[in-house]
Curated annotation (Swiss-Prot):
Organism: Claviceps fusiformis (Ergot fungus)
Superkingdom of this protein's organism: Eukaryota
One GO MF term attached to the UniProt entry: oxidoreductase activity
Disulphide bridges, residue numbers: none
Keywords recorded for this protein, A-Z: Alkaloid metabolism, Glycoprotein, NADP, Oxidoreductase, Signal
Matches recorded under Pfam families: adh_short_C2 (PF13561)
Function: Chanoclavine-I dehydrogenase; part of the gene cluster that mediates the biosynthesis of fungal ergot alkaloid. DmaW catalyzes the first step of ergot alkaloid biosynthesis by condensing dimethylallyl diphosphate (DMAP) and tryptophan to form 4-dimethylallyl-L-tryptophan. The second step is catalyzed by the methyltransferase easF that methylates 4-dimethylallyl-L-tryptophan in the presence of S-adenosyl-L-methionine, resulting in the formation of 4-dimethylallyl-L-abrine.
Protein name: Chanoclavine-I dehydrogenase easD
Glycan attachment sites: N40, N55
Designated gene of the protein: easD
Residues at which NADP(+) binds: I18, D66, R132, Y166, K170, T201
Length: 261
């Protein structure tokens, strides 16, 4: 029996991409309840249908949540515990991309203030608000194995003279995760981070708006030495970190796919 079987999980950004792949794998391994938060509701029905085909006994609860809103995040997580009585694990996957290759040197002078705030609001503040609220509700539950996984990026290891907001948000996400991990480990809560490389998700074309097709994007990255992974590859690492199989790993930042440059 899987160590996530019969347990309750929360997944931000869970309606598509890596988040949806994580939900499907949790269902495949017997999770009792998966609570999905996403600002985009259009994929909720298809996600629920796909999970029903994988495991009809897994309950999927989808909620529209803007992770950059403290109120949205707090209400969602408190609602999970109020309704289901527990929360064993959470994956904070919600995030947005930033287009590369649109700026000319000096690229820093073309970094837009509004885009900077928007990217950091979702990719960094959203992770902070979610992790803080998850720790708060988990702390008040009976002592048990509990795990939180945040999703950063290979950009956390990179020094690219472009996409400053995205790289900063992901580097800060990884740093934040390791600090929180050291803080809460003694409360029985493990916190870890996953940093995907180039991953085939709906966000991928948004990073390379000048490239017309997915095949061309894959070729571009392959020529730079970066193979393309699938969302399911990342999901396997997230679910492992959520499970008791990964005890006592905490404060880790695991790259999935391309290695750090």
């Amino acid at each position: 029996m899987s160590s996530v079987s019969a347990k309750i999980f929360a997944v931000t950004g869970g309606a598509s991409g890596i988040g949806a792949a994580t939900c499907r794998l949790l269902a495949e391994r017997g999770a009792a309840v998966i609570c999905v938060a996403d600002v985009n509701c259009t994929d909720f029905a298809s996600l629920q249908e796909s999970i029903a085909q994988i495991n009809a006994s897994t309950l999927v609860q989808c909620t529209k949540v803007d992770v950059s809103s403290v109120q949205d995040v707090n209400l969602w997580l408190h609602g999970i515990v109020s309704k289901h009585g527990d929360l064993h694990g959470a994956a904070n996957v919600a995030g947005i991309a930033q287009a590369a290759g649109l700026r000319t040197k000096l690229t820093i002078l073309e970094e837009d203030d509004a885009e900077w705030r928007r990217v950091l609001d979702i990719n960094l503040n959203g992770v902070f608000y979610s992790t803080r609220a998850e720790v708060k509700v988990m702390r008040d539950l009976p002592l048990a194995h509990r795990s939180i996984v945040n999703v950063a990026s290979i950009a956390a290891f990179s020094h690219v003279p472009d996409v400053y907001a995205y790289g900063t948000s992901k580097n800060a996400c990884a740093y934040l995760t390791t600090c929180i991990a050291a803080d809460v480990f003694w409360s029985g809560i493990r916190v870890n981070c996953v940093s995907p490389g180039i991953t085939n998700t709906p966000l991928l074309p948004q990073f390379e708006p000048k490239v017309k097709t997915l095949d061309e994007i894959r070729k571009l990255y392959r020529e730079q030495g970066y193979p393309t992974s699938e969302a399911e590859d990342v999901a396997r690492t997230i679910v492992w970190l959520l499970s008791e199989d990964s005890r006592p790993v905490y404060g880790a930042n695991i790259n999935v796919g391309a290695c750090p440059p």
